[in-house]
A protein has these predicted regions:
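N-terminal helical cap/lid subdomain that shapes the substrate entry/recognition surface
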Residues: 2-88, 97
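A short, structured active-site edge motif that brings together acidic residues
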Residues: 40-42, 107, 121-135
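Short loop-to-alpha-helix "cap/lid" segments that border enzyme active sites
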Residues: 130-141, 151-155
Length: 201
């Protein structure tokens, strides 16, 4: 029997990061004198930071601006971000079942860990991975299920042959998540709790 190993996405899965990300983008826009439609940015969270910044900055500026964003982030974002409904319970359900839970996110690992520390969630973090990069982590860590809010999360699950559990708390609708291959679509993370007993081991 294999061990239950469940990965969780961070932004818009475990946490509502829109207020913190929005505050950081507003500060970045003011500091650089660059227009950034922050409401648009926070409506489509998921892809890596550099991919979003490329919509607003010349390609050669993206690396330095990304570094500045990440430097601003701890003070501006961490205090503004709260757990989404059922997050603590979903993680605890995995642990209570004798499983391992950890975070796999496109976000910078250091800032992701700061969120978890601030919210008193003790989980390991694998950061700066997206789409097929997440699938590689799933394979390497023996993940049996992954909880995410984005179609690319579900595509990573399909690629790595793990159970995909989707929550429509981010930019993707339930229908989009199902079409991307989600095995389960739950309203919020409380729905994950009921799925844990039947997840592969």
């Amino acid at each position: 029997m294999t061990r239950l190993v469940v990965g969780f996405d961070l932004d818009m899965t475990l946490v509502d990061s829109r207020p913190g990300i929005g505050a950081t983008y507003r500060a970045l826009a003011e500091e650089t004198g660059t227009f950034i439609d922050v409401d648009l940015v926070t409506s489509r969270l998921g892809p890596p930071l550099e991919a979003e910044l490329a919509h607003w900055f010349e390609p050669e500026r993206v690396p330095e601006v990304a570094d500045r964003y990440r430097a601003l982030y701890p003070d501006l974002a961490i205090p503004r971000v709260e757990l989404l409904r059922g997050a603590r319970e979903a993680v605890q359900a995995v642990l209570d079942a004798g499983g391992e839970a950890f975070v796999v996110t496109g976000k910078n690992g250091r800032n992701a860990a700061l969120h978890l520390q601030h919210l008193a969630i003790d989980l390991d973090v694998v950061g700066e991975v997206w789409r097929e990069g997440k699938a590689d982590v799933f394979r390497a860590r023996g993940v049996t299920a992954y909880v995410g809010d984005h179609v690319h999360d579900m595509e990573a699950c399909r690629s790595a042959d793990v159970v995909g559990i989707a929550v429509p708390t981010g930019p993707c609708s339930p229908d989009e998540l199902r079409a991307a291959g989600a095995d389960h679509v739950v309203d919020d993370l409380h729905g994950v709790v009921g799925l844990v007993p039947d997840l592969p081991r």
